[in-house]
Each structure stands twice: as structure tokens, then as C-alpha cells.
Design a protein with these regions (language model features):
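Juxtamembrane regions of bacterial inner-membrane/periplasmic proteins
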Residues: 1-186
């Protein structure tokens, strides 16, 4: 009876999930104004900045070792799950009560973190987590792993007002993300 009630409770959230798309993300970008100097070289003469600074970059321009470093750190089973890492989710849930780990272990996958950023839903509740799980599975059906990873890497914060891998690479290493070496990517 308890199991049936739990299944009915969880399945009610399936109908509550609206389609979430990557295109819904509101990303703020800086605007750069360029002019040619006396030698004909284009130079940045003015930059209009937003609260968060971000420079978009295609997944094709992000080296494989940089992608691998993100996946290894954030979601080691990213390429094999359907948006939800059930092992991590159950482990994080059990840790809330039993404290197996010294710190709170996140159970969210890259896709789930992206959902949280798209929706802005940060409520700490089982119902939000269930909605997030269904939305993550939906997003995984609608987009490729590369598109999800690209959007995630262009969105996440790297400290201060720096958001996205390209802005962070330029800020911290003085180079494009496409030029990061293995040590810098880690």
C-alpha cells in the first residue's frame, strides 16, 4: 500500500512538468564595440557589461580534455544516464538521514543542474526534486549530450561575475577556452 501511494505521488508530478527548453534560458552577455586603428587592426574600444559576464563558445571549440574534466568533476556518468544518475540520487537521499559522507553529496547531474538554472526553481523539497528529475529526462530526449554540456559550460559561474567557460578562461588564464591545456582545464 505504501509503495503504491508513493508511485501515485511521484507520477502526479509527471503531469505537472511543462516542457523545458534550453532556448528558455535568459543568458546575459556583454556587448563589445570595435573600431579600426590607424594600422587597420580591429580593437575593442568599449565594452558594455552586465552583472554577470559571459562569452558564448561552441562545444566544438572546447577541447575534449576540458569537456572530460567537467564531466569527471560534475557528473562522471553523464554520457551513460538519461538525465538522472539514480545511484547518486539515492546516495544523496540516504546521506541526508544516515550521514555516510562528511559533506552533503549532491545527487544532481549536469542535466539536472541545467534544469535548475533554466527554471530558477531552487525550492528545497521532494516535489521540486521529482519535477527536476522528470524535466531532466525530457531535456535529454530533446537535446544531444553535447548541446546540454555546451549550454551548461556556457552558463555556470566561475566566481565573482565570471560566467561560462570562455569568460573564465580569458579572465583567469588570459586565453580562450579552446587553448586551455590539461592542467588549466582541471
Amino acid at each position: 500500500i505504501v509503495a503504491t501511494a508513493l508511485v501515485v505521488y511521484v507520477m502526479n508530478f509527471r503531469d505537472d512538468v511543462s516542457n523545458v527548453t534550453i532556448e528558455e534560458m535568459e543568458l546575459s552577455y556583454n556587448t563589445n564595440i570595435y573600431a579600426q586603428d590607424s594600422s587597420g587592426e580591429w580593437v575593442n574600444i568599449y565594452e558594455v557589461t552586465n552583472e554577470s559576464q559571459r562569452i558564448p563558445i561552441s562545444i566544438d571549440d572546447i577541447p575534449q580534455h576540458t569537456r572530460d574534466a567537467f564531466v569527471c568533476a560534475e557528473d562522471e556518468r553523464f554520457y551513460t544516464h538519461d538525465g538522472v544518475d539514480y545511484k547518486r540520487t539515492v546516495s544523496a537521499f540516504v546521506n541526508m538521514f544516515v550521514h555516510i559522507y562528511d559533506t552533503n553529496q549532491g545527487g544532481s547531474t549536469i542535466t539536472q543542474q541545467l534544469i535548475k538554472n533554466i527554471t530558477g526553481d531552487s525550492e528545497q523539497s521532494p516535489s521540486r526534486k521529482i519535477r527536476e528529475i522528470f524535466r531532466a529526462m525530457e531535456l535529454e530526449r530533446a537535446y544531444s549530450k553535447d548541446k546540454i554540456l555546451e549550454t551548461y559550460m556556457n552558463y555556470i559561474g566561475f566566481g565573482g561575475t565570471s560566467n561560462g567557460i570562455e569568460h573564465a578562461a580569458q579572465k583567469y588564464f588570459g586565453k580562450s577556452a579552446k587553448d586551455l591545456d590539461v592542467a588549466e582545464a582541471a
